[in-house]
Amino acid sequence: MAGVGSCNVADLDLPAEVREHLAGAWGIEELYPPQAAAMPAVLAGESVLLAAPTASGKSLVAYLAILRRLLVDEIGSRAIYIVPLKALASEKVDELNELCGAVGLSVGIGVGDRSSESKKLDDADVLVCTSEKFDSLLRNRERFLEGVSVVIADEIH
């Protein structure tokens, strides 16, 4: 850590490919104070509730929690990223596809009752879904949570 309230991406205990992608492709070299404050707990695998203003980087903290868990702590496990709206799910899938693709992880989306989603839901390392879809999966798929090591709830109100 560079100083109180700051954190250089290069110093994070994450795989080199993740740090390189953040700095190179996304231009992120230093975390914002709310992100830096959350990282010790995230990197320790603790449960975290992050409340911060809009555009303060909460999603990046969630992404890093997912990558740390799937690439370091529980290799071969899966993640679920729950959002309230289909439009937000699409946005998160785009961002996660770029970041996860750089490290060999796949991302799937679950936003409706389309049967074509079924196989993709099972195969995805990271599943982004609406809260309604998540509820449906819990009720209708007995073994849905098997292998899941991290769950992110975004935009809870």
What are these regions (language model features)?
Residues 1-11:
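Interdomain "pre-motor" coupling segment immediately N-terminal to P-loop NTPase/helicase cores
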Residues 13, 18-157:
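Conserved P-loop/Walker A NTP-binding site and adjacent catalytic elements of P-loop NTPases
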